[in-house]
Amino acid sequence: SQSDQPKKDDGTLTATAPATGQASNLTERNAQQRLIENLQKNFKTTNINVKVLEIKATEVPNIYWVNLEGMSPIYTTADGKYLIQGELIRLGDKTLHNVGEAFQSEISKKALASLKVEDLIVYPAKGKTKHVVYVFTDISCPYCHKLHEHMAEINAAGIEVRYIAWPRGDQFIPGMESVWCSADRKVAFDQAIAGAQLPPANCKNPVVDQYKLGQSIGVNGTPAIYN
């Protein structure tokens, strides 16, 4: 009989029969939208000028991962009243589990993919390129110096290195801009690493934008290496 035939799912949402899970997904989206609105309201009340880009539910009940414009991601409670800065770690396995790692990896990949190669300092691999790594660097950073000393052997191993400007403080911005404004950035970077004073920059450059991009994906020191 007709009643025995399986009913076609037309995607209609009802309060009583979320058979396909669409209704529960809609409820979750609505909850997340309310949370974004609550967060923005609370930020404004506290005189924090920041924009919420996206939020995602975590495996922890009532705890959400929040991606902010120009800032490192944070966590918040479901009511948007409490913020948690730093990593959220799950115990109980043989290794520690970073709850937000997958979310962070996703936005990092998108951010790095948005960079124009011509805005970077690129050290290509020797022979076949096996890997490409992105390095947020600063000419004043001692560990960046150490890494740079091994560039030839890194390239010889088939690894292409792409430097991104990340001045560690306002006082280091002019030096980084001088490198990025040079006709040959590699030569300028080598000279700056060696302690040379480069002439002041006088060009449109991506140094500050690259710094902000680094901040948005959680960079808080150099060298910060991503692949």
Spans of features found by a protein language model:
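Non-globular targeting/processing and membrane-anchoring segments
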Residues: 1-132, 212-221, 226-227
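Structural alpha/beta surface segment adjacent to cysteine/selenocysteine redox centers
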Residues: 124, 129-203, 215-220
